[in-house]
UniProtKB/Swiss-Prot annotation:
One of its GO terms (biological process) is actin filament organization. Binds to actin filaments in muscle and non-muscle cells. Plays a central role, in association with the troponin complex, in the calcium dependent regulation of vertebrate striated muscle contraction. Smooth muscle contraction is regulated by interaction with caldesmon. In non-muscle cells is implicated in stabilizing cytoskeleton actin filaments. One of its GO terms (molecular function) is protein heterodimerization activity. Pfam families: Tropomyosin (PF00261). The modification N-acetylmethionine is found at M1. The modification Phosphoserine is found at S45, S174, S186, S206, S252, S271, S283. This is Tropomyosin alpha-1 chain. The molecule is in a coiled coil structure that is formed by 2 polypeptide chains. The sequence exhibits a prominent seven-residues periodicity. The gene is TPM1. The keyword Cytoplasm applies. Keywords: Acetylation, Actin-binding, Coiled coil, Cytoplasm, Cytoskeleton, Muscle protein, Phosphoprotein.
Amino acid sequence: MDAIKKKMQMLKLDKENALDRAEQAEADKKAAEDRSKQLEDELVSLQKKLKATEDELDKYSEALKDAQEKLELAEKKATDAEADVASLNRRIQLVEEELDRAQERLATALQKLEEAEKAADESERGMKVIESRAQKDEEKMEIQEIQLKEAKHIAEDADRKYEEVARKLVIIESDLERAEERAELSEGKCAELEEELKTVTNNLKSLEAQAEKYSQKEDKYEEEIKVLSDKLKEAETRAEFAERSVTKLEKSIDDLEDELYAQKLKYKAISEELDHALNDMTSI
């Protein structure tokens, strides 16, 4: 009997243990079902989150593509602007070289004009000397005319003084011959002076024509210098505009680079979050 009671107790105990295990199994089953439901909900949520992340990734990829295209366009514009600036620098250099050559030609023309003015001054001084000589010759001729008048007066007085005629006549004739020789000599010198005066006059006319020619050239050089100065100002204005354009492009490039860097950081954060989500799903 004791053995049966003992066995009955053991069976009862086993039954109670079995009931406890059944209840525990039921509880574990319910907990597993709840955990499964929770995991399914989390999976659906993660799938939705993954879908949203993929959509956002597509959006950021498109934005990144647009940013890259804008960056390439900005780089192309910057390259074109640099080429324009280089071209302007070459044009400015050519204009400066042409201006230097024009200044050299102007300096040469001014030097020649100064030499021509000096030659004209020397010719003018020569003219004054010639005029002074001619005036002296005229004074001599006037004196000779006076002497000739005196000789004629003496000849008229010879009729009244016959005794003195022979002696004075010889003297008068001799004086008259000398006076005529001096008069002929003066006439020859006057002819030479007139010829020299014509030569000097022609030289002065030639110098005046040459001076006028240099004046015209000087006006032409001044006009060329003015045109070159205007071109230089225009080139400087265009160069300043190109520099401002390059500055704006550089700022745009910097802004795009900052935006691209921010997008990269955002993309990196999203990628890390997506990796964590995938790892969580894998571990589940």
